[in-house]
Amino acid sequence: MGILKDGNHTAVTEFILLGLTDDPVLKVVLFTIILCIYLVTVSGNLSTILLIRVSSQLHHPMYFFLSHLASVDIGISSSVTPNMLVNFLLERSTISYLGCGIQLGSGAFFGSTESFLLAAMAYDHFMAICNPLLYSTKMSTQVCIQLLVGSYIGGFLNASSFILSFFSFLFCGPNKVNHFFCDFTPLVELSCSDNSVLLILDSFSAGSIIVITVLVIAISYTYILITILKMHSTEGRHKAFSTCTSHLTAVTVFYGTVTFIYVMPKSSYSTDQNKVLSVFYMIAIAIPMLNPLIYSLRNNEIKNALKRQLSKKTFS
């Protein structure tokens, strides 16, 4: 049943996910579409990771971060999609209490880590364009590892705050989550305890990450733009712009979607609209699937490395 009664207390052992639709035919259609998207997401990001590892010309800080961004994108999509695909095939979509907490935490971890990685990549572009003579020392292997570890630690700390909040919530009976995965807001609505302090802490944690990473990105690109405008060479300007366009596109897609879902006032759109937007964010239509396409189509070094690897396979 998903609900256990112990004296005067009611314990929720599982949650019912209301999902996107109850229509059996539409469920099959959505299952097929989302499965295809998920397979493209995983294969595209794995290909990006493999290409960077085997191509010596891509062994630079920028692509070091890109390979980890691809890993995080797989994590973002995998934290939700497999369970969602299974539930499309079941008459009753459920997730265990523990599974819900894990899903919430993994989504927060990978989403937060992606924010930090995008900020680290912006800083890398800043150093490459604004301080080219100091780039090799300022972006040494040690510095890159420190930025990477810091990104994962930041993601872990933010995820920990959400996980601790979730397991502190009291659920007194209602266990129907009006979403297709365990997102924080629908779970808060089901809780019967006073969560005001926890909500403030979690909002502060998530808000701080957005503010800090956006500031790093904005400041980095402000200096980059100033430096580019001072360049006298048209070729130099074009090369600098081409270096940044892929990252700027990924940043715009990521923060634009996150802002629409989690920052805009809830009264400005319905829960159903929020669920549809979350599909774009979590499943891959907006971020995990697009990132490999963005970097492969807009980045000449990635395209050239791919051509070289394909040529080796053809003539080997």
Swiss-Prot record:
Gene Ontology terms, MF aspect: G protein-coupled receptor activity; olfactory receptor activity
Principal cellular location given in the protein's record: membrane
Transmembrane spans: 29-49, 58-78, 103-123, 137-157, 200-220, 241-261, 275-297
Protein keywords: Cell membrane, Disulfide bond, G-protein coupled receptor, Glycoprotein, Membrane, Olfaction, Receptor, Sensory transduction, Transducer, Transmembrane, Transmembrane helix
Glycosylation sites: 8
Extracellular side: 1-28, 79-102, 158-199, 262-274
Disulfide bonds: 100-192
Residue ranges annotated as Cytoplasmic topological domain: 50-57, 124-136, 221-240, 298-316
Pfam families noted in UniProt: 7tm_4
GO biological process: G protein-coupled receptor signaling pathway; sensory perception of smell
Family: Belongs to the G-protein coupled receptor 1 family.
Function noted in UniProt: Potential odorant receptor.
Protein name, as recorded: Olfactory receptor 5P79
Source organism of this protein record: Mus musculus
Lineage start: Eukaryota, Metazoa, Chordata, Craniata, Vertebrata
Gene symbol of the encoding locus: Or5p79
